[in-house]
Design a protein with these regions (language model features):
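Long, low-complexity, charged/polar intrinsically disordered regions in eukaryotic proteins
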Residues: 1-13
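C-terminal regulatory/oligomerization modules of transcriptional regulators
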Residues: 1-4, 113-142
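N-terminal helix-turn-helix DNA-binding core of bacterial DNA-binding proteins
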Residues: 10-51
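N-terminal positioning helix adjacent to the helix-turn-helix/winged-helix DNA-binding module
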Residues: 22-25, 41, 82, 93, ...
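Residues within the alpha-helical elements of helix-turn-helix
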Residues: 48, 86, 103
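Basic, amphipathic "hinge/linker" alpha-helix immediately C-terminal to the N-terminal HTH DNA-binding motif
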Residues: 75-94
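Arg/Lys-rich, alpha-helical DNA-contact motif
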Residues: 91-125
Length: 142
């Protein structure tokens, strides 16, 4: 079967979605590492994601081009203002999904693992509903 533009469209979207997930995961990780250790180095990201130094470097370079991270050779990695905003949104979205999973009886370990994947694929509408249900459960439990 010959490849046409319409055949490759789903694959292009999948690659774009994976690229976005990676960006979100990396800015969230940089924020977490900076909070925990006061600075983030390339080796910290490679260790955090269990990837090679080369892979982490390639992703950091891409995120620099996208204006999410800034760094210089042998210097710590920092979040730009744009990167900080994305990290905050990602952390909030992650926490809502995690709390929702806990509220429906999922154990903490499974909820933490599942939230990592779900957070990237939940629509804003669904996320709002998750948040409403979590808040309703919290107010009922108080």
């Amino acid at each position: 079967m010959a490849r046409t533009a319409s055949n490759s469209t789903p694959h292009q979207r999948t690659r774009r979605d994976h690229s976005t997930e990676t960006a979100e995961d990396y800015v969230e990780a940089v924020a977490d590492i900076i909070t925990e250790r006061t600075s983030c180095r390339l080796v910290d990201l490679a260790e955090y994601f269990a990837v090679s130094h080369v892979t982490a470097n390639r992703i950091v370079a891409r995120l620099q081009k996208e204006g999410l991270l800034s760094t210089e050779p042998y210097q710590p990695i920092e979040l730009t203002a744009k990167g900080k905003r994305l990290a905050v949104r990602c952390r909030q979205r992650h926490e809502i999904v995690y709390q929702f999973l806990l509220s429906i009886g999922i154990d903490e370990q499974t909820a933490a693992i599942d939230a990592e994947g779900i957070e990237h694929h939940v629509s804003p509408k669904t996320l709002r509903r998750f948040e409403e249900l979590v808040q309703r459960n919290e107010s009922r439990d108080s």
